[in-house]
């Protein structure tokens, strides 16, 4: 993997580290030799913070093997005043910074500092060690020099490692993790690194040797101690992307359509390392898009981020990255008291496949072509539909469309259906009409747009219900919707008692998902096209042109004839 030369073209879907399939990279040192590594590190500098496990399960002899590995690693790096610097933290119940970056810049001095470290012992709090790395371990780090943290552990941390690891990555620190023995929690290693490529595992501390030091050094150096490929960030409350370039970055990274929002943009002044760039934004800002999924059950979060390489202008080298994270909903375990009975009870469980739901805008009719361009005032149909996966003959689910809004892509939103599924403004959208299956709803509307904003996108929530044993009664169709000014036709008016049941029955729904239309570009008027001439007029024009052409030919022939005759009649 190599740093990208102004090319970050990709579309990524990432899963939160909590649901990553835990697997570790075996050590592959077959093509790595000392000469290759020496050539790689000679002209490259890096700030390395090494975190050694000093918990009670380690012991003094095993801890010394970690110190030997630290010396192997230091000998591979270009340790010098202008080259690489190293800091070291040993951690147990309480982490301790043994020496800081830049404190020992000569290989002999650094080796002496490592040898004098004494084993600490205690509980395993890797999270605290990562926090100490952020608070004190980075002191003395030079601007423009990439930063790497390497964590060695033989088990499971007793505190949280996810949040401090994310904070380190936000500070442009690339984290590597080495798990020793089969008892190590590989899942936590993935949480620390954020990328399985930077996870190494060995079976014993005897394998913390020169070969591993070579493999680790090469893995870091071959991408110049920066991310080799763009990496996305799926935080608990934010989303983003990180990448590296071959040349110093002088442009801006921003959320599409939000260049002028400071929270949604990062420039060179925000990148300590001008070749390691990226942007993270909170879920609540920059029009970050979120929608729920029932299968698998969880939430998708997505945003489009633009890498603009010129400081002022968009150019052909700029790239847009669509970043998507999926946050899976954890299973809920409910404990209930059990009563002992001599009577055997038989339970039968029925599993239903969830329907596939879609929201589209149709031209001219509810089943017309999907609209992506429309004219202001044009009649277009909203269409919500859930299709039974098990076959059209099934009649398992019903649906309620509710909580709809229209968005112009700049964070400006206007509600058009309320939480009960009723229309709010007849000019924008009235209460949808449902067919008898309760899995299809449609409603016509006349195209509108925001002032100076030609693009619209609609989003709604669909709550599903099981029709079995009256499970959709009181949920759908929407109940007791008020007639809106300027609205005609059928309206859903029901007994007030059913209205009171709606909130209670919505909670009984199978699940709620988010659906949204394609973006629609609204034109003020249709482009003027030149009308073809009527057929009789075309025919007349052809006759006229023919007569003129024949006349010209006749005149030309007469002229030639008279000229020729005049010459013959001249006296010799």
UniProtKB/Swiss-Prot annotation:
It holds the Pfam family VWA. Residues 233-479 form the ZP domain. InterPro entries: CUT_N (IPR056953), Cuticlin (IPR051962), VWF_A (IPR002035), vWFA_dom_sf (IPR036465), ZP_dom (IPR001507). It is found in: Cell membrane. Keywords: Cell membrane, Cuticle, Glycoprotein, Membrane, Signal, Transmembrane, Transmembrane helix. Residues 47-216 form the VWFA domain. Residues 1-24 form the signal peptide. SUPFAM superfamilies: vWA-like. Residues 563-572 are cytoplasmic. This is Cuticlin-6.
